[in-house]
Amino acid sequence: MIPDRNTRSRKAPCWRPRSLRQQLLLGVLAVVTVVLVAVGVVSVLSLSGYVTAMNDAELVESLHALNHSYTRYRDSAQTSTPTGNLPMSQAVLEFTGQTPGNLIAVLHDGVVIGSAVFSEDGARPAPPDVIRAIEAQVWDGGPPRVESLGSLGAYQVDSSAAGADRLFVGVSLSLANQIIARKKVTTVALVGAALVVTAALTVWVVGYALRPLRRVAATAAEVATMPLTDDDHQISVRVRPGDTDPDNEVGIVGHTLNRLLDNVDGALAHRVDSDLRMRQFITDASHELRTPLAAIQGYAELTRQDSSDLPPTTEYALARIESEARRMTLLVDELLLLSRLSEGEDLETEDLDLTDLVINAVNDAAVAAPTHRWVKNLPDEPVWVNGDHARLHQLVSNLLTNAWVHTQPGVTVTIGITCHRTGPNAPCVELSVTDDGPDIDPEILPHLFDRFVRASKSRSNGSGHGLGLAIVSSIVKAHRGSVTAESGNGQTVFRVRLPMIEQQIATTA
């Protein structure tokens, strides 16, 4: 069956940050990453635009200088000056106005008739692969573009017509690409370093800011482990004043928790006071009821001594009065015992042999319920515990009585004693009472040791007041032990664990 969507706990996906520290850290890193990446991208694009503009300007200046040098060369050729007599392949090397890295060429009918690559050491003819790359393109005076020119790499190139020839210029992009690449590497490194520093600072700042919240949580966890069921317990733990400042969110949580603890502490004190008054009332009422009940029972017995002179209906009525007076007296005695045990009545403790006590109790039960089969699974040697003999005998008797009263004849009841050096409440002595009668209703099982609780109809014959197991639980608690009940698959087991004394520990070592 699928739990209701309003009550079932929703488990967060494994990819989702679970702690507030992780959420804050990832949130800050996400925001800082977006901002730094945006700034880095803008700076790289800005630098790229600036370098491109510089290359465009240099390309225009280079083409202008080539036009000027080409015009002077043609004018010199018409006046038969020494420069004008040089072939174009030589004259191009003498052209001026070019910066290192620039490439110029003069084409005639798509064929390079002169070229020069400028450097710090002067001009030299363009390599053959560069010339082939230039001649492979169609230069029709379009806008500047980027071309890969063989061994020289990427160039931003342009051309213009000059009579029957075409002038070609190219500005190297090697330096510009290096600058942009270096800028990208620097930006990535700075973004990474900034993220590392931001993460470290965020972890420290968030950890410092959340310390009050952790202290508040520690206070709540401490209260959660307190035994609030004790009558004399008070919640003395509070969030310290420094963590209850209402001007911040953590302080609001701490202040609210203190108010909650005050309210719970007051409610517990009120409950304890009510319980104490109720116990005192039960004790007083039990004391007051014992005398009139004894009188009723006594007068009924006294009157029945002359039963031969009484009508049958009167005889029957007196018998019922006497029987119900006994039941009422037993109920009052049990309530009085429970009240005394709840108030922490001092026990008359001594070291006693639990095995001998159980044997006597089983023998009494076998006489009271001969229709049941009684099996003793007891050790041969004595098992020593420290306790009140009368109370422990009543504990065992109540468990055995519960076994035969609430089961049909023929049921097997097994009583066992085991010494445990490990496990729950160890070292301890475990007394178990097992029967193969009907199972106890699972809905009743968790409340089996409460007052006035009876087993399911399949195990109940209608007798009893529902106080026997409550007395068992109180006696066990008074002896610093524990009692549990299990029922299922045609078997019901009651287990009582009592502390093992040093003498028994030495015996079982």
Swiss-Prot record:
Protein name: Sensor histidine kinase TrcS
Post-translational modification comment from the UniProt entry: Autophosphorylated.
Disruption outcome: Cells lacking this gene show an increase in virulence in mouse model of infection, with significantly shorter survival times. In strain Mt103, disruption of the gene does not affect the intracellular multiplication capacity of the mutants in mouse bone marrow-derived macrophages.
GO MF annotations, alphabetized: ATP binding; calcium ion binding; manganese ion binding; phosphorelay sensor kinase activity; protein kinase activity
SMART domains for the chain: HAMP (SM00304), HATPase_c (SM00387), HisKA (SM00388)
Keyword Nucleotide-binding in annotation: yes
Pfam families, alphabetized: HATPase_c, HisKA
Histidine kinase domain span: 284-502
